[in-house]
From Swiss-Prot:
Keywords: Cytoplasm, Endonuclease, Hydrolase, Metal-binding, Nuclease, Ribosome biogenesis, rRNA processing, Zinc. Belongs to the endoribonuclease YbeY family. This is Endoribonuclease YbeY. Zn(2+) binds at residues 130, 134, 140. It comes from Streptococcus pyogenes serotype M1. Its EC number is 3.1.-.-.
């Protein structure tokens, strides 16, 4: 999986960047998404607040914002078009590969790791996997959806070795 990592805060250690990259690749393998692309941006609470207001109309910072990429209009080309211009097939594959972007608030991750009594590394991993599952179509609006998503989330984190202890 190709993952673009951006640290807008200047506060994310190389270890956390590498853990996030490794964990998301692990999650991609577990969910059959190895051929996909996404981005992860680490932000402050202030930036998280702005994004939450812009995309979710919620006037407060949040821990992770998941923006699933869904093309509004499918790009369709005829076989003649594809034969005449092979770059069209490459372009279609690129659009199909990109699944979305995550914005993880470093400030919220620190607050929540203390609140829940586990490591910052575990909280960062939790937020990355939680957001990853959202941009892959998982949600928790109903009890059934919540059970499915949270079970898979915990399975991934446990198999990776990021437990709550």
């Amino acid at each position: 999986m190709y993952i673009e990592m951006i640290d807008e805060t200047g506060q994310v250690s190389q270890e956390i960047m590498e853990q996030t990259l490794d964990l998301l690749n692990f999650a991609a393998q577990k969910t059959g998404k190895e051929e996909k692309e996404m981005s992860v941006t680490f932000v402050t609470n202030e930036r998280s607040h702005e994004l939450n207001l812009e995309y979710r109309d919620t006037d407060r910072p949040t821990d992770v914002i998941s923006l699933e990429y869904k093309p509004e209009t499918p790009i369709l080309f005829s076989q003649e078009d594809l034969a005449a211009d092979p770059s069209l097939a490459e372009m279609m594959a690129e659009f199909d590969a990109y699944i979305g972007e995550l914005f993880i608030s470093i400030d919220k991750a620190r607050e929540q790791s203390q609140e829940y009594g586990h490591s910052f590394e575990r909280e960062m991993g939790f937020l990355a996997v939680h957001g990853f599952l959202h941009i892959n179509g998982y949600d928790h609006y109903t009890l059934e959806e919540e059970k499915e998503m949270f079970t898979l989330q915990e399975e991934i984190l446990t198999a990776y070795g990021l437990t709550r202890q």
